[in-house]
Structure formats: structure tokens, C-alpha cells
């Protein structure tokens, strides 16, 4: 039988002084009314609260805190805190590998809803020729897979297939640019190279399957020549996706994948790359440049989306599926507005065929510019009905292309005498009278749907405003306005 002192004041109502810890171990609450001298080291595993302000809490010697999971705040409850000596507050932890938190964008901002889609593409019914251009060589071929909403790219021997977006996408300094590209590359084959990503012929970031070698590649032309820096899977600096990385996942390169990269270009920023697997962004490799390079790491971040299949002789195939390019943190329209018009004396129109009034295209040496038609104006010089059309890529008769000025990205024509072919993207009616009118090509402040594109071979789109009259040789005046995004 245990020894008890039922009349001992120190032991009466002992249960009232007891409490249990989080691990259900008994603890004794005590109230210390006088000072305690402590020598040596005292480890306090939980929280220590000092709340008897405005009393003085003297501390001598050194107080060391190994780690703090939350920000530290000091509340003096309206009094004052006096500190003698030096306080050293260590900076937040620095990860030399880079920004590994995929809940934030390339600049460390929390990924929230303020994202502006610059481009998206799916292939539900066809090869989407308004958005994509194709270049074939040798045995290269494409085939639309209706039931898979995909494009099959294939070779039966030596040959190649390139699928590239007709437009490049406007990068704004200080905003993260996120690219997502989906594909199925199939079985790795010797002598066959397969690529997909955010890149063009001279610059960009992409995933590559070179035979059986898996790479993430940075392409740059800053030296005047194209240089590919390919990082093979064993040398990825975050998650090698070989089962040993933070995710524990093995990359199945022959299966359908979502490749992503986000770019903080600014000429010298970092580029994060990886895959989206099981709904999670997994960072595989980060290209760092600030504090390392002597200049920019690639010429521009305004680039196209591109897929490639190249074979030196083997039969091969891969599938292009979907892609998207997003400006994270929104997009602010800081474009330059430019316009050109016919002479005020007007241009004689036919009553049978459409006559081009104003046409624009990208300059041959500025094919990576972002140019978006925004509005047009029409005025008939006779009291009669007229019709207009906006035509993409007509064949113009006797055009005389001129540069608006040295700063503009556009050449224009107001001299062509006729046109044929092309795709009508809008049409309507206007009436000759004592006043004209403006018509918007796009209905929002920032709308890239009518952006001028170019082919892989370097041929610009032509955007043409044309009109037809009720009576032959009736005259009309026209002007075309566009935005140039740097």
C-alpha cells in the first residue's frame, strides 16, 4: 500500500495542479512567485509566454533560439521594450537550388486567379491552321486523330515534321510567363529526336527525347549562332524523376506528358522546368543566370510553341495534343498604336470584286514582333451603299509595300489594285454620307485573337481591309489601326 499524508497541505487537492500534455503525459502546474536562478542549459520544448508587463524581465548572458517555424512578434502591451547590446536576427533560409515552391510563380508571387491567357490550342476537329503551321521534309507526314483530338506526326524513314504556332507570345518584364505543352512521344528510338516546348528555331526551352537520352534543353542565339544546352536526366538539379527525387516518381517518357516551364526572363532571370503529374507541378531542373552570366541568356522570351520530330532513317511517330501560354500576374496593354490610311481623295472601287484599301504585314526582319489590328475606319464619298471585308492572307495584285517608319514593326500597302483568295474574317455594310465611322476589330483592350502570324519559312500574314461599291468607280476612304507590343 502506498504511503499517504492525507493531512499534508502540500498534497491536498493535488489533482487540481495536474494537467496532461499533448502526448497525454501528466504535468504539474506551478506558480513561482519569486525569481529563479538558472545555471547551465534549460531546454523548453513548448512555448514560453511572458505576460506580466509592465514588469521588467531581465535577461543576462545569451539566449539562443535554434529555429522559429513562424514569424516572431513582440507585443509590449502598450509599454516599451529596451534592448541593451546587440540583437542578431538570421535571414530567412536561402535555397541555392532555387525557388522550389510551385504554389508561387517564377517571381515568387502566389499563384492566384490573376492570370492572362496569351494563347491556347486544342485540336478537336482539324489541325487548326489559323494557329499552327507545318513544315515537312523527306518522309515526314501529319494526320489528324479525330477521336484523340491530336495530331499524329510521323516518318517512315529519313525525314522531319515541325509544328509551330504562327504567333509568338508577348512577354512582359517582371511577370512570370508560364507555358504548358502536352504530348505523347511514344517509344524512344535510336536515330530519332522528338521535342516539345516553348521555343523557336533560335531561342527557347523544351523537352527532348534524343534516341533514348532524356533532356531538358535551353536554346540561345545570343552569340549569333544557335547553341543548345541540353541537361540529361541524371543531371537535373531538383527532381530527376528517377524514383530517387522528392516526388519519388519515375518519368515514363513513352507516355503522355504535360511539360511546363515558367520564365522570369528580364534577360537574366531563372527558368524553372518540369512536369505536371497527378495534378502536381513537379520541378525537375532550374536554369539560373543572375549573378552567373555576363549578359542575357537568350535573345527574347517572346517565342512560339513548337513540336518537332526528326528521323535519320527509322520509322517514328509522336502526338501533339494541347498547349497554353499564360502571363502570370495579368497583362497590361502598353502597346504602341499606329495607323495608316488611303488618301482623302479616296480610292476607286469596283462593283464586281473587292478592292484592297489598306493592308499590313510584319517586316521581314521583325517576324517575332507582336502586332494586333485593333480598329478600322471607312467613309464612302458617294451617297450609296458599300460593303467591306477583313481578309486574312489574300493574294494582292501590284502591291507596293512601304515601311511606316524605322521604329514600326509593320510594312503597309495602299496601292494594290486587286486581290484574290484569302480568308474572310469579318464583313459588313457602310453607307456613303457626310460622316464615317470606326469599327473595332477586337472588343477588348487586350485581344490577341487577330495577331499577325508568320510561317515557319518566315512569311508574314497579310491583314487586308477591302471594299466593294454599289456603282463602279465609286470612291471610299479607309484607314487601319493596330497595336505593336514590345
What are these regions (language model features)?
Residues 225-258:
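Short, aromatic/His-centered strand-loop micro-motif at the edge of beta-sheets
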Residues 13-17, 205-212, 263:
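Broad, structure-driven detector of short, well-ordered beta-strand segments within folded domains
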